[in-house]
Swiss-Prot record:
NCBIfam families: glmU (TIGR01173), PRK09451.1 (NF006986). In the N-terminal section; belongs to the N-acetylglucosamine-1-phosphate uridyltransferase family. In the C-terminal section; belongs to the transferase hexapeptide repeat family. Its cofactor is Mg(2+). This is Bifunctional protein GlmU. UDP-N-acetyl-alpha-D-glucosamine binds at residues 11-14, 25, 76, 81-82, 103-105, 140, 154, 169, 227, 333, 351, 366, 377. Homotrimer.
Amino acid sequence: MLNSAMSVVILAAGKGTRMYSDIPKVLHTLAGKPMVQHVIDAATKLGAAQVHLVYGHGGELLKQTLKDDKLNWVLQAEQLGTGHAMQKAAPFFSDDEDILMLYGDVPLISVETLQRLRDAKPQGGIGLLTVKLDDPSGYGRITRENGKVTGIVEHKDATDEQRQIQEINTGILIANGADLKRWLSKLTNNNAQGEYYITDIIALAYQEGREIAAVYPARISETDGVNNRLQLSRLERIYQAEQAEKLLLSGVMLRDPARFDLRGTLHCGMDVEIDANVIIEGYVTLGHRVKIGAGCIIKNSVIGDDCEISPYSVVEDAHLEAACTIGPFARLRPGAELLAGAHVGNFVEMKKARLGKGSKAGHLTYLGDAEIGDNVNIGAGTITCNYDGANKFKTVIGDDVFVGSDTQLVAPVTVGKGATIAAGTTVTRNVADNELVLSRVPQVHKQGWQRPVKKK
């Protein structure tokens, strides 16, 4: 069916006392981003014309964190219930648009479920998302008459017969803007809590003869809310299990799906293998036949075909061409670039540095602000000294250079093609092509040398 224009209201004003945190509840992260951002993303993908975010506790931190110019911020200074929150947003509703109500602490709601809810909303009626639970204790029950939804009864107000009902209210609903504003204006707070409940509009709509259509989510976990860290950790595992399942079914080999975390977006080629305890963050692309070892962290990086990242390496904002090998225990920081066949070994760190085709930095090395040519050997313990305490400077190393162990290159400095830097050298001046450079204290031999002994 053809959907009307739609705006979304996200309720995010609660403090989240049971989180025991100074951070607003909806800013606690799931899969690397705030819970409320998951909900905003779903609303955006659904095609919302406007997203109204109802906020209260920690509003300034919310604005600093989300930084979304498209959000309409609606202040609920005093939290007097879900109906009160919607009343605050109501002045922004257009009469001819549908309004979808979501929650900032229900992060797993899917676009597919919301689209089915949107499609099911009757003309002039309400679309309501409900679920059936084996143990519905504490939840508002959905009452029906001849199969039609007639209202929602809170658990504390329900009769013994009504408490046997397993269908409960999730709080997620959609209705026309004009109808919603009218029903919201009729809400009262004549209850023990002195709050305005959005659930009361169901009975108001039924009294007007409006149809209420109930829709079930694809998975019950989509409607699970978060009130404490235990619930958040459970949703994290549910989310990660779903992501792992999708990857496995698409051909990615996860050696232990229960110990894999995806905190962003991952694109994989054919025959990719990922070992246990790997974390993927941001936007990551893995080419064909890439192997990621145990305990690695890959963030916002492109890894070319046939690359192998050995265990416990960290790769962030880096670009690797085909057939590169990394680690174990290597760190590629932002701006690291490896050309085809390059190798970075254990305890090597790179930042804003390019390592040419077939070049190697095998052990215990720092390469920062450096441009290194093809077929270069960087010996163990080499350091590009790029910082003078105030400014950064660049080191340039040409093709086919051999850099011996324990070398310091004090930038700015250029080493020409084919040059050889002897072990233990400190390079402070440019080196010409094919030169040998060495700077060492002369080696002294003392025959019959006696070591000092401790005095008794």
